[in-house]
Amino acid sequence: AKRLSDLTGEPARTIHRLLEVDFTAKGELKFKRNETNPLPADVVIADEMSMVDALLMCSLVRAIKPTSKFIMVGDSNQLPSVGAGNVLKDLIASHYIPSVELKEIFRQAAQSLIVTNAHRIVNGEFPVLDDRQNDFFFMNKSLESDIAELVIQLAKQRLPDTYGFSPIDDIQVLCPTKMGMAGTKELNKQLQSALNPPSQNKAELKFFDVIFRTGDKVMQTKNMETVSNGDIGFV
C-alpha cells in the first residue's frame, strides 16, 4: 500500500482508518462510514485482502457506493485472517467475481530455490531441502535451546562471514511463536546481547521486562499517523 501511495500520490490508509473507526456508548466498535455515509471514492483498492475477516469485509462493502469500483489485491495462499472467515480465498473460489492470478515472480530471481519451494508447497509438494548451493537452506534442530544457539551463530558470525552481510542491517530473524527459548521474546534478548551489547556510551530504557538500548533495531507493531505496522528503525 505504501508503494502504491508513493506511485499515485494518493494517501494509503488502513481499513479501520478509512472507515473512520468509532465506539458506541457501551464501548463497542463501529464505523462512521456506511451505506448512509459512504466513502466518496469512485475506486477503492484494498491490499493484503487475505488478512481481512468477514466482519471487516462486511463493513467495508457497506461503505462503498454501489456505483464505485472495488479492487481487491492479495495472496489467497497466505494464512487467513485472525478473525472469522477466509474472505479472499472464498470469493475467488466462488467464481462470482472476475479475478486475475499473477504467476510470474519479480522479487527474486527465476532460478531462486525460495521461489521453487514456494510453488512446491502451494502445489502440495515437499520442498527441496538438500541443495546447499542455492538460497534456501534447511537446518534440522530438535531442542529449542539448540535452535536459539544456531540462530545466534547464523546472525552474528556464519552469514556475515560467508556473504559479507551486516548482522544488523541485512539480516532479519522470523519466529513462529513469542514464547519459549526459540520465541521472539527470548531470541530478542539473546540477539541484543550478541549484536548490541551494553556499554557506557549507550543509553538504556527498561520498559517492563524489555530493555531498549541505543543502536537496537526495532519494529513498529501498530499503525499510527506517521509510521506503519512493520516499519523498521533504530533506537
Residue locations for each model-derived region?
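ASCE P-loop NTPase helicase motor core
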Residues: 1-132
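Short beta-strand-centered aromatic/proline hotspots
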Residues: 229-235
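Residue-level recognition of short, solvent-exposed, well-ordered loop/turn junctions
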Residues: 39, 65, 211-214, 228
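Conserved helicase motor core of P-loop NTPases
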Residues: 76-225
